[in-house]
Amino acid sequence: MKYPDFSLENTLSGIIAGVDEVGRGPLAGPVISAAVIFTDRDTVIDGINDSKKLTPKCRQVLYEKITSVAKFGIGMASVEEINSYNILQATKLSMKRALANLNLELDYVLVDGNQPPEVKWQVKSIVNGDSLSISIAAASIVAKVTRDRLMEELHNKHPQYNWYKNKGYGTKEHLSAIGLHGITKHHRKNFAPIRIL
């Protein structure tokens, strides 16, 4: 398996942040973005990859390693913001907040995908960036673990939806629970199939 590396970062100079989001598709919960900067590219953390390719246990281990050596910022767009705007605008908002929470002046921002937020720094959009750039891949891990932990906390308040397991995604079990119990304030009211209930 080919792992992301610093090849993209090494074509640029200065302070470079990788940004990725998680939680665009679920029916419940916020969208979370993370921004990660490796100030010392000689630091090697084996196994960093797109978070979707990793087991939950592996993500947890890598999260602890990444956050102990890298600078990182977390940004969130709430369910209210997702309902008020749309998921694309809410995602961009969460990315901006993650970058702002770094509290650093940057030279470049590497963003996974092709719809980056408008920020004051130079931005490079990279499709499949979480499989190419180690900074973006690390951001995907930090964002995923952060959101998963949040959904597990929300599960304790609303166990009937089993968010501990499905993390708010539209599984058959989650949809069945919505049919039985209705929706909570944590559900995205403008997402199908909730919108048509």
UniProtKB/Swiss-Prot annotation:
GO terms for cellular component: cytoplasm; ribonuclease H2 complex
Q: Where in the cell is it found?
A: Cytoplasm
User: Known catalysed reaction(s)?
Assistant: Endonucleolytic cleavage to 5'-phosphomonoester
User: Which EC numbers characterise this protein's activity in its record?
Assistant: 3.1.26.4
What GO biological process terms does the UniProt entry carry, in alphabetical order? DNA replication, removal of RNA primer; mismatch repair
Q: How is the cofactor bound?
A: Manganese or magnesium. Binds 1 divalent metal ion per monomer in the absence of substrate. May bind a second metal ion after substrate binding.
Matches recorded under PROSITE patterns: RNASE_H_2
Keywords (A to Z) from UniProt: Cytoplasm, Endonuclease, Hydrolase, Manganese, Metal-binding, Nuclease
Identify the residues that bind a divalent metal cation: D20, E21, D112
Q: What broad class of enzyme is this?
A: hydrolase
Main location class: cytoplasm
User: Which InterPro entries does the annotation name?
Assistant: RNase_HII (IPR022898), RNase_HII/HIII (IPR001352), RNase_HII/HIII_dom (IPR024567), RNaseH-like_sf (IPR012337), RNaseH_sf (IPR036397)
GO molecular-function terms, A-Z: manganese ion binding; RNA binding; RNA-DNA hybrid ribonuclease activity
Cofactor section: Mn(2+); Mg(2+)
Residue span(s) of domain RNase H type-2: 14-197
* Family membership noted in the UniProt record: Belongs to the RNase HII family.
Q: Which HAMAP family match?
A: RNase_HII_B
Q: What does the function comment of this entry state?
A: Endonuclease that specifically degrades the RNA of RNA-DNA hybrids.
Protein name listed in UniProt: Ribonuclease HII
Q: Which organism is it from?
A: Wolbachia pipientis subsp. Culex pipiens (strain wPip)
